[in-house]
Amino acid sequence: MQLLNNWYSLLLTEVAAYFTSTTLFVSILKNAPSLSWLMKYGGHDNFGLKPPLIATKLEVPKRWFWHFYAFISLLNPLFTFFILNTNFPIPIFKNIKEDLMYSKKLQVLLLIYEIHTLRRLYENLRFRKSGSKMLAGHYLLGYLFYTHTFLALLLCGRRSYENTMSSMQFVGLGIYAIGSIWQNASHEHLIAQKNHSQYLVLKKGCFKWITGPHYLGEIIVYTGIALIAQHWLIWLVLGWVLCNMVAISSSYACTVKNKEQSLDFRWTLIPFLY
């Protein structure tokens, strides 16, 4: 039991440290103009700043985003199947198996996260015409983020064996569904834009009021997941998502403004706030 507790504490500390440190790092970079090139998101303007030459040599196609979603969409069910169909005497594996079998909360979280990543995989595969580039570091961070989020979901389900979901968890499930529908609708507009030979001004749906509604959709999805999980570790995940979406939506808004040359006011990410 002591070994199990040590492993749990170590994993909990590592995952918490990852999300805390990366969130702080992104926050610092966003407020450090000379380092803002590290935040350069494929296809977005970098507020007029050019990255060092070596950074341009360490870029990969932005369409490789689909690799993250394929990876986590396979990891989730394969890990679950592996744990449920093996009988390792190692305490930590036995405990995870019990959680997967008896924690309704964990079962729901892994299911909706699988649905989310499969949807994002489908959308990204349809986005593969993009010729934009992203920093190789962002590519590696993608794998780290989804791996750590998966670990966070497993950790928050430890010995959480409630038979029924609370009213707040049902609210979270509804928010997750709204966020998924919102984000998918936004991505469909973006996919339609990509299929045009010339830049298409997006003014339909949520794009009437918000420059980057697809980024807001990501925040809504993870807010729903956090309400279902009801664990402080998932709130750290949401904090990372919020910080990252604010940074990305800022550069995206700059890109859209330069391409559209429009005087119409739209919120960047969150209506009435930003």
Swiss-Prot record:
Primary site of residence: endoplasmic reticulum
Keywords, comma-separated and alphabetical: Endoplasmic reticulum, Membrane, Transmembrane, Transmembrane helix
Subcellular localization(s) per the UniProt record: Endoplasmic reticulum membrane
GO biological process, one term: dolichol-linked oligosaccharide biosynthetic process
Membrane topology: Multi-pass membrane protein
One term under GO cellular component: endoplasmic reticulum membrane
UniProt key word Nuclease: no
Transmembrane segments: 9-29, 64-84, 135-155, 165-185, 219-239
Top-rank lineage group of the source organism: Eukaryota
One Pfam family hit: Steroid_dh
Family matches, as InterPro entries: 3-oxo-5_a-steroid_4-DH_C, Dfg10/SRD5A3
Keyword check for Cell wall biogenesis/degradation: no
Gene Ontology molecular function: any one: polyprenol reductase activity
Family matches, as PROSITE patterns: S5A_REDUCTASE
Entry's family note: Belongs to the steroid 5-alpha reductase family.
Name of this protein: Uncharacterized protein C7D4.09c
Organism: Schizosaccharomyces pombe (strain 972 / ATCC 24843)
Taxonomic lineage: Eukaryota, Fungi, Dikarya, Ascomycota, Taphrinomycotina
